[in-house]
């Protein structure tokens, strides 16, 4: 087993190994700048959306003025009728009402078009982000997944991107419309009375100060909310995957306690952020209503002195009421942008994660791989400050079977992971056929090597599809031959649908031993020149082990093979046995040679039979 260093954070069923909440957004402006770079490819659609918003608002702001004209016409007509000088011109009023209806209909149409276009931009941006994240995850080293929980990574892919898309769509649409509305209303208000406009504008500085204070306070809570959501998702995901283990070890109480802690973190950050965001609307409305009262008093005074018409009062009151609304909407949009920035920051952190070392410019082309493997002074540590493989050197001839044995944590699995270049070396080199493995592309290197891990991983899909994963171009006959070599063909035929049997998620509809046999068959099908069997028989019973051991013996003929096994009886016929302890080679030789030395290997071997 690998002695991979675990980070200091708790992991496993009772610990998540994730970052805590409460962290303030590091760079709001920088994050938003990066975000808007993703809008550039859709800038034409974005600009058309803004234009639609401008047109919609420009048409809409005329409405209250026309309503005021209708009221003025009615008031003047009524006064004329009282004075005996005529009456109300209903034909003119009907035409004005029809014009008003047409104006509002056009404004609604442009507003809908603007919302549709903005929604398209934000969703395309979300699509692009998910695409880049999916490409990024294939470029990340395994060390990234050692340090970050699956739940947190999943939360970045789903919750954070969804939050980003939805909040950005709503905030952008609302903010563009609100800014244009403020300008339009201000122009119309000034056209009626600069004095009343000045009275109405008194409330703006108060509202802006309030918005800035609340936004500053709420920003860190929105970031904490997103991160706490990642904690909760990660814990639930792990509990679902390991629910049997949790129950077996009576860990329900600790699991519930951990969930309660994470849920409390989410609750605390969520209610604080929502409390602050909820304050903005009522407080800005209160300030707006105070200004509204002042406008009404001043408007009445100006009407009495003949400076404005009666209908202008109604128009201005409508503008005043509507003028405070976009200010409130902008404050809410700023609030949503905090949520956008918090989610975007986590997404960009993922996209900015350090990738695997770049591929070599002119890679070695492998044609006739012999399978000669050389480890030369290899040093490695999952944490650079804690070396787990110490100056490891070994030469393996083509076609040799090399067993790597040792107690748990000795570094056995680490060695083969380094051969596969899952991790980069701290020092030293590994060669295949005389070429440093860094001279090959990673895909080319891994095409040379077939690997069967202790954890038998199969995908949701048919057995045939899972076996073909080792060689997508394989024919049905080749798949069947590989299954026969792994002694799993008989089992497959006992299933109702044979090779077309669909494995469910986590392949729980077959046993662990059967899953292991299928992964071995998958490696057979790949027909690699170098074979790695990492505890390949550890999950099968003795009878099944005997069957697949025969198949593996046939498979390993003519191939360079690395076998990692706890059951030392399975590697007695290996050409070389490397005995490791704490990252060091303590003994090398054949089974008989090592037994004669009566050293560390002999103690391991005898200990197993004493246990048996």
Give the residues covered by each predicted segment:
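Transmembrane helix-loop-helix hairpins at lipid-water interfaces of multipass membrane proteins
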Residues: 2, 46-110, 190-195, 306-310
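Juxtamembrane loop-to-helix connectors within ABC transporter transmembrane domains
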Residues: 21, 31, 39, 118, ...
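An intracellular "coupling" helix at the cytosolic face of ABC transporter transmembrane type-1 domains
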Residues: 41, 142-143, 161-168, 172, ...
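Transmembrane helices of ABC transporter permease
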Residues: 45-58, 69, 170-224, 295-308, ...
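Hydrophobic alpha-helical segments in the permease module
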Residues: 100-107, 111, 204-212, 277-291, ...
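Cytosolic ends of transmembrane helices, especially the final helix of ABC transmembrane type-1 domains
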Residues: 119, 228, 251, 275, ...
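ABC-type nucleotide-binding domain
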Residues: 352, 359-360, 366-612
